[in-house]
Every structure is written in C-alpha cells, then in structure tokens.
C-alpha cells in the first residue's frame, strides 16, 4: 500500500478514533468556540465517559477500478445507494454492523465483533457467519483520551492541513459547528515527503483530492457527523457521510448462536 493511501487511511482513522471517544454530555452548554482546531479537539475531550454510539453511513459515486491487475482502469463501478449502520459498545469493545451495496449485485452483509473475534457473512457467502480471530476491533482505547487528542492535534498540524471554521448548520434539533479541510493531490503527497509509491489497491489514490467537513454539536461539543468527498480525476469520485447518534444508550451485542456459525473455517 502506498504512503499516500496510508496517510489518507490514517487521517480517516484518526477522525474515526475521535468519533469513538466522544460522549453525550448533559451539562450546561459549552462556551462558543471559534478556532477550528479547538472545535475538533473539544469534541474529542468530551468523550472520556462514552459508553456506546450508533453510526449511520451513506456512500455515493463511482470509481474505475483495476480489478484485473493489468494497470488499466476498468468499467465504472457504481457505489450509489450504499449504506451501512453500526452499534458500538465502547465499554466492552464490541460492535454490530450491517451494510448494503445495491448496485453491486445486490451485495449485503453483517459483521459482529466480540472482543478479538469477528463474525462476518455476506449475501454472496451464504447464510452462516464465518469467524476469524484477530486484534480488538476498536482502533483506540476510549479511555485514553489524551493519546487521541495528541494524535488529532498532530494530524491537524501537518503541512497543508489547514482546517477552516464554516457556517453553523442544523443538526436535527440542535446547531452544529462545521470544520472544513481541503487537501489537493500535491498536499496529500507532501504528507508522505513527496515520494508516493505505486498503490496496491485497485484504485490509484496518488491523484486523489479530499474535501472534508466535520460537524460538532455546539451545546455539547460532541461529534455529530463527518462528510467527505474523495475525487480521483478520470477514475471517479466518492462521497460519504457518517452520522453519530444514540450516545450512551443501552446496547446489547452478542456472538451469533453456534448453529449460525460455519465450522472448519
């Protein structure tokens, strides 16, 4: 995987890390913030006691992927209408997610993470879950907020990463700050020291630009959403939107029954 791909993944990963340490806070409204970096880091700092969260995702656009490995982009693959939803138990480190990609042969699937075990099935693999042992699903310890804040601050201090406070917007029944980050292909490549390598992915991210908008509730400074557009020139573009809700509501996530898990995998 190229450094450019890793940097994009790291940026998204850090923002995702921020999302899982943000909590619903019942205290009085926070003072108004004007600095975009303070808005993002404030959202992280409110997350020291988060117990659970629900995430909804939508994905639209199309890409031309080199699925044959020949180096030539293939036909456009539509991602329009793709959706996903997840409940995350931050205390136990468990998660339950579902997804659907209607434009890709009606693909759908379900994943359950219990500790270091992942159970996964799709409409192409049959009715039973396959299980796999691995590392814990959550990329950070929700209680280690200082580490996450430091990582976010480091990411926001990189050359070319210049967050800008946008207009406040409605978020359901409340108001949200918006923080915008725009990165050109050259700025993304500069994050890798200007030495991008050939990507091992079927899509070359070396020419990708990124437009990112982070939504943070004004009254609680908790993360409300992340929207991003990744433009890849002739290879297409993808837009996704994540919304976060049901903070600290009761959630029960358990492994599937044994008779629903494929044996010998």
Give short role names for the model-derived ranges:
Residues 2-5, 9-10, 25-265:
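Subset-of-secretome marker
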